From Swiss-Prot:
Lineage: Bacteria, Pseudomonadati, Pseudomonadota, Alphaproteobacteria, Caulobacterales
Similarity comment: family membership: Belongs to the UPF0260 family.
Protein name, entry field: UPF0260 protein Caul_3920
Annotated PANTHER family: UPF0260 PROTEIN YCGN
Organism, scientific name: Caulobacter sp. (strain K31)
Superkingdom of origin organism: Bacteria
Length: 162
């Protein structure tokens, strides 16, 4: 008997069910960071400042179901807008699958462990500050973090080491 391939290898993003789509999120937290766009160059500038609803230790949204009410500019990822979201980190499963790439070895769907993204050092767990810490949103520019946006898909990670 041959093993059945996982859904992310057999379905397009458009064909996935809502639970399948949601399970692609590795929980790194990179998409919950405040970003700026340089008006002259169009360059996206990531920061170590997270959305007010982001739980910096769990790397999850504190009110995912209602997030758009509190944070109207929160972008809901869909199969229809993923190609326009060039600011998504290169290691993001949504972006990788859209680009025809595989999931990284540390991805929770591969490991079966939601902690693997943190153990591999890919997430922003406990490395960010809340946007609520600033009276002026532009102060987030003091926390520019271009280092967070390099491709972490192939990090040297040993699942046996904590």
């Amino acid at each position: 008997m041959t093993a059945r391939k996982p859904f992310w290898e057999t379905k397009s993003l458009n064909q996935m069910t809502v639970p399948e789509w949601e399970s692609l999120c590795d929980g790194c937290g990179l998409c919950c960071l405040v970003r700026f766009e340089d008006e002259d160059t169009g360059e996206i500038i990531p920061t170590r400042v997270h959305c007010q609803l982001f739980d910096e230790h769990r790397c999850t949204c504190k009110d995912y179901a209602n997030r758009k009410k509190t944070v109207p500019d929160c972008i809901k990822l869909t199969p229809h807008n993923i190609e326009t979201l060039e600011w998504m980190p290169p290691s993001c499963a949504y972006r990788r699958l859209h680009e025809g790439k595989t999931l990284p070895l540390w991805h929770p769907l591969i490991t079966g462990d939601r902690e693997s993204v943190h153990q591999a050092g890919v997430s922003v767990r406990d490395q960010t500050v809340s946007e609520l810490s600033f009276s002026d949103p532009e102060d987030a520019l003091d926390f520019v973090a271009t280092d967070l946006m390099y491709d972490k898909s192939d990090v040297d990670w040993d699942p046996e080491e904590p």
